[in-house]
Amino acid sequence: MGVQSTANLPKETVSHLDTAPTPKPGVLLQVRAGRIKKGALGGEITSAIYKQQHDGPVFCSATGVLGDEHASSGHGGTERAVHQYNPDHYPDWRAENPPEPDLYDVGAYGENLVTTNMSDENVCIGDIYKLGDDVLLEVSEPRHPCFKLNSRFKWPRALKRTIRTGRAGWNMRVLKTGNICKGDTISLLERPYPKWSVLNVQRVIRARNVSLNLLAECTQLPMTDLFLDIAKERLRSAPKTYTLVDAHLVAQRVRKLTFALKEPLTIVNPAFDPYAFAQVTFGRETKFERSYSIVDGDIYKFSLGVSLDRQSRGGSAYLHNELKIGDQIEMSPGSNPGAMENDAKCDESLTRVLIVGGIGITAFLPSMRDWESKGLPYHLHYAIRSLEEAAFLDQLPKDKTTLYIRSEGQRLDISGAIPKPNHDGAYNARIFSCGPSGMMKECETVAKELGYPDHMLHFEDFGSGGGGDLGEPFEVEVDEPDSNRHETMTVPPNKTLLDVLNDAGFDVLYSCKSGACGACKVELCEGKVDYKSTALLGKEKGKALQACVDRGIGRLRIEID
C-alpha cells in the first residue's frame, strides 16, 4: 500500500545535510531497454521511455544497455548511460490518485535497472557500485525530469509532483563494461560523498532557502554539467553578505565603495557577466533596496560608484553619509541576458558609440576595459556638469573620449554623435547610452529615426528597475486555488514572470530556466503570450506558458498549481 508524499522541496529551508544511509547489497530484478518511437506519447512526442525487460544476459557498454536508445540529445551518452529508479515509489504514486494510476507500474519512468534496497535517499553522487561479476557503475546525477512525464502518465501534474517530491531516480556512468543479468547482485564499493544523496542534491538546488556553504559544496561534486551549472548559477545569484572595506570620493559627489565577501566561499567562476549590476540591500532601521552598476571586481570583491542624488529618497544619502568601513550589505548580481544576446547578433568589429551623462559612466567602465584589452573600437561622448563632478576621468583613454563640460558652455549634440547609415543602408556602429532620462530618450529617438535596429541599441536605465531588456512589461493576474490567493502584479522589462512570481512567494517550480524542460509551466486562463519556450506542445500554446522565458502581451490571467 502506497503513501502520498507530503514533501515539497521548493518550500524547504536546508541548512545542513545528514549522512545518507548505506544501502545493503541488492538484487537486480529487471534489465530494461527500448527503441525510439515516433508519436509514442499522445501521438505527438518522439520518445524511448517505453522499455522492455531482458531476461537473459545483456551487454552494458560505456553508453548503456545494449539495444537502448534515447530520443533526446540530453539523454544517454556516457554521462547518463544507465537510468535507475526505485520501484518502491510506484505504489506511492498510485496513492496520489493520478487520473490513470495503473500507468504507474515498474518501468514507467523509463529506467534501465530495477533493483532492491536502493533509493533516492541512500544512493549518493559519486557512489561506485559493482553489478554482477564485471560491471562498475558511478552515480552521476539525479534524473532531470521533463514535460514528457505529463504525457507518459496522462497527468498534467506529473512533472511538478516528481520535482516537488524528489522521486526522480538517478543516472550513472559505466566505469567498466560487461554482461548483466536479472538476479545479479549490486553492491556499494566506494562512497566519497556520504551526505550528498540523490535526494539531498535536489533539496539543495531547489530549496527556497539554502546554506551558501552547501551550494558551494554542491558545485564541487562529480556531477553532470547540467546539475553543476544549476548549482553554480544558484550560488552566483544568491544574495550574499559583504563588508565595506574601502570608501573614498572620486568626484565631488561620487563615492567609490568597495565591498568584500564576508564568508569564505568557493565559487567556480567568480567573474561577473557582461553588463552585470549589483542588487543591494542596506540600512539599519530602514532597509533600502537599490540597483547600481558594478565599476570593477568580481563576486569576491567589487566596487560601486554612487552619486549623491540631489533628490535622494534616502538610498544614496545613506551610502554617502552613513555607511562606514566594516558595515555590511547584502548583494546579489543582476544580469542582462538580452544585452549579451544582442552582442552575439552584432559584428564585433563595429565601432561602439557611447553617449553618457554624469554617473552613467559607471555602467560601461567594465565594458570599456574589456574592449580596450581586445583592441575593439569605441568612442565615448561624456557629458558632465563640471570637471569637479566628473567621476573616473583617470580611467578614460583621452584619445577615445570627448568631454562636454556644461559649466564651460559645451553641449553634447546627440544627433551629431550618432553615425548615420552608409549609402547602402548598412550601419557601422552600435549605440550605448546611460545617463539622465532626457538624454537617453533623445538618443533613442535619434537612433530610431535613423533606422537603427533594436539589437544595435543598448540603454542602461536603473530608474525602471535596471539592467535588462527581456521584453515589454506586462500585467499578470495570478490565482492560486490551493491557498485562495489572488494577486495582480507587473512584470518589468528586466525580469521574467518566474522571477516576479517567486519574489512574491508563489514558489513556482523551475529547473532549466531556458524554456526547455517544462518545470515552470503555469496555466493560462486569459491573454496573449509571446512564446519563446520549446517545451510546450502545439496544443498547449494558448492554454499554458513557461514562466521562465514566455512573456505576456498586455495583460494575462494565470493559475498556479
Curated annotation (Swiss-Prot):
Residue stretches making up the 2Fe-2S ferredoxin-type domain: 474-561
Cofactor(s) essential for the protein: FMN
Induction of synthesis: Expression is induced in response to 2-benzoxasolinone (BOA) exposure.
Annotated signal peptide: none
CDD domains from the UniProt entry: fer2, PDR_like
Its EC number(s): 1.-.-.-
Quaternary assembly: Monomer.
Family classification: Belongs to the PDR/VanB family.
Function in brief: Reductase; part of the Fusarium detoxification of benzoxazolinone cluster 2 (FDB2) involved in the degradation of benzoxazolinones produced by the host plant. Maize, wheat, and rye produce the 2 benzoxazinone phytoanticipins 2,4-dihy-droxy-7-methoxy-1,4-benzoxazin-3-one (DIMBOA) and 2,4-dihydroxy-1,4-benzoxazin-3-one (DIBOA) that, due to their inherent instability once released, spontaneously degrade to the more stable corresponding benzoxazolinones, 6-methoxy-2-benzoxazolinone (MBOA) and 2-benzoxazolinone (BOA), respectively.
Protein name (database record): Reductase FVEG_12641
Record organism: Gibberella moniliformis (strain M3125 / FGSC 7600) (Maize ear and stalk rot fungus)
